[in-house]
A protein has these predicted regions:
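Phosphate- and divalent-cation-binding pockets in alpha/beta enzyme and binding domains
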Residues: 23, 48-51, 141, 173, ...
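Active-site metal-binding loops of divalent metal-dependent hydrolases
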Residues: 9, 44, 193-194
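Asp-based, Mg2+/Mn2+-dependent phosphohydrolase catalytic module
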Residues: 184, 203-236
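Non-catalytic pre-domain segments flanking phosphatase-related domains
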Residues: 1-7, 23-26, 179-183
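Asp-based phosphoryl-transfer active-site loop
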Residues: 2-18, 201
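Hydrophobic/aromatic beta-strand patches that form the interior of the parallel beta-sheet core
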Residues: 39, 63, 189-191, 208, ...
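Conserved acidic, metal-coordinating active-site core of Asp-based
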Residues: 93, 97-203, 212
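Active-site phosphate-binding/coordination module
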Residues: 16-113
Length: 236
């Protein structure tokens, strides 16, 4: 059994929005009892991941917000937050152009009001991501603005555009985790399906992909499996 197992959630463990099985939770608890570490690495916020994995929440590491935050046993192991001046600048640009801007905080997402931009404290919590509601509009002006700040696009679909600190990614968080628990690349297994997983998949040759993985991910080389949850349950 690997000392450290790191898995993406959406598209990897969660493919058809089916709840994870009791056998999976039992496996993670057994892995922890043997001194192993399991980390879930996702673009989702910490509070969502904790609810999904509440049965094992005290035994696993949560890497949330595309690597911007890492939590273990309710303690912060690592974070790379959005700088307040950058958050204000991007949110101001978004509001000026008619977009809704949302700040992803540790425990909640909070919409930004224009009057907040003039306040010195702005938000009373760390900002891990800035989420823009696209409403079918072109967001190139916001992407251009981000390039002048310490921000990068970490996720985009037809409805949302998300920014995080340009140095925040899953790979950097996993590196910190490896250092903390003295794990080398041969003792680690990483599972993922999308381009935002490449930074952590590149840290080891022990890579597993679901069948639906993006071609850029498959090109890294690794094992392709039909069901990631079943694969983890059956690990020896």
């Amino acid at each position: 059994m690997y000392r450290l197992i790191v898995s993406d959630y959406d598209g990897t463990l969660n493919v058809n929005d089916k709840p994870l099985s009791q056998n999976f939770f039992t496996k993670l608890n057994m892995h922890a009892c043997r001194g192993g570490i399991f980390a879930i690495a996702s673009g989702r916020p910490y509070n969502q991941l904790k609810k999904i994995l509440f049965q094992v929440s005290q035994n696993i590491v949560f890497i949330s917000d595309d690597g911007a935050q890492m939590m273990y046993k309710n303690c912060v192991l690592y974070k790379k937050t959005v700088d307040i001046p950058d958050a204000k600048a991007l949110c101001s640009k978004a509001l000026d152009n008619g977009f809704t801007a949302i700040c992803a905080l540790r425990e909640e997402n909070r919409s930004v009001k224009r009057e907040q931009l003039s306040l010195p404290f702005f938000m009373n919590s760390d900002i891990f991501k800035i989420i823009i509601v696209k409403d079918g509009e072109n967001t190139d002006i916001l992407k251009a603005a981000a390039q002048t700040l310490n921000l990068r696009v970490c996720y985009e679909d037809k409805d949302y555009l998300e920014f995080c600190h340009k140095e925040a990614n899953k790979g950097e968080a996993v590196k910190k985790l490896m250092q903390k628990f003295s794990v080398n690349e041969n003792q680690m297994l990483v599972l993922g399906d999308n381009v935002n997983d490449i930074s952590m998949l590149s840290l080891t040759k022990n890579r597993v992909f679901p069948q639906n993985a993006r071609q850029e991910v498959l090109d890294l080389g690794g094992t392709v499996v039909e069901n990631v949850e079943k694969y983890i349950i059956e690990l020896k």
